[in-house]
Amino acid sequence: MERKLLSAQTILPISSKPIYYSSVYLENGKIAEIGPTDSLLKKYKNVKHNDLGKGILLPGFINAHTHLELGWITEHIGGFGSFIDWIKIIISAKKNHAPTENQIRNSVNNGIRRLIKSGTTTVAEISSFEGVDKEPLKNCFLRTIVFSEIFDRHSKDIKKIKLEKSELYEERLFPHAPYSCSPDTLSKVHKYCLKNEESFGIHLAESKQESLFINNQNNHFEKSIYPLLGKEKFSRKKASTPLEYMIKNKFFDGVRVSAVHMVHVLEHELQIIKENDIGVILCPRSNKFLNVGLPPAKLYKELERIGLGTDGVSSNLNLDMFEEISFFYLTFREIIGEEMAQFAVYAATLGGAKALFIEDEVGSIEPGKAADLIFITPQNYYKDPYLTVVSSTRSELALSMVNGEILFSPIN
């Protein structure tokens, strides 16, 4: 039985108020107890005690949406004007510069290293190369959810899919988007998840073009992208918004869904999100990079299932969750007010866990949860410890662990 005691000046449980000059007792990779250091030392004799000192101990970041497998593609991305232009670049790169399996694996491994060095302990990764990228993810020591990306070409095989799951690794389905998956494909994914009690993810409401597509209006997906892919148009129910489209087709019924981006969502749709218990994952820097707008963060402040993701380096500058958090904070501070720092840190931890439906395992410092923790030693301390986290950078990460096992520690 492995036992550890971590002491810190500040502990941010996320699920409760900050705790000062206390400790977290770990047993077999789980959080067992939080309390005063002296009391825990007396209670647990001969425990390995690591006094971290001045700094903040908090749950590891949950990067709730990435495309590590596309790391190789950055050398083909130059200037572009619109989201559609960017999609054309991605299609061209995949067609004319198809990556080798080694390139894909190297992209994933490089991404994993970047994630670990910037405080991520759980990653939700999209797998779009028929599983080539899964092996490095199984062995990376991060807590990993791999979403197998589904397009119409996979439709006939959905029933046969077998999803793997172990302590640190889990597979789920990810129909790409309403404009790239026909209603028939989405229906098959929904039925599969309903039958097998699985959740799925989807890119949803990312761009205005998607809203035009859903409304059966002229759009650049059908006009410009389908011809490049040799894809035929498909009939669909008309809806005013992507969220309404999913509701009309009953694709949320009885299943848990993690919806990524959710930029073009209307105020009245907040109630729909709550009623259907949808997990919302925001990628604000990616949205800015791709010029699709910014999510209605003030609306989402009311949600518990609200997470943050960096997306991939194909649509962002890096995979750094510290930078994602600070961008999120600075972008919406004026709109949301003084609670923005706490909201940003929540979305990067417990909110992300809830958006991925893994809050029973990770996301906060509570007894029974996995010891997926990070410790930062900020240069600048604010009165508000959440603001201190927001102001921190990856260079101030002093410790990262998953299941109580150290992943990163520059001092060791």
Model-derived features: where do they sit?
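N-terminal metal-binding scaffold of metallo-dependent hydrolase/deaminase domains
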Residues: 1-43, 358, 405
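Alpha-helical scaffold segments that flank or form the walls of functional sites
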Residues: 56-57, 74-140, 161-166
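Active-site beta-loop-alpha junctions enriched in small/polar residues
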Residues: 67, 128-129, 147-153, 176-178, ...
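Active-site gating loops and adjacent loop-to-helix segments of metal-dependent hydrolytic enzymes
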Residues: 72-105, 145, 208-254, 328-336
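Histidine/acidic residue-rich metal-binding segments in metalloenzymes
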Residues: 132-139, 158-279, 291-306, 360
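His/Asp/Glu-enriched, well-ordered alpha-helical/loop segment
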Residues: 248-252, 282, 295-379, 392
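C-terminal cap of metal-dependent C-N hydrolases
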Residues: 370-412
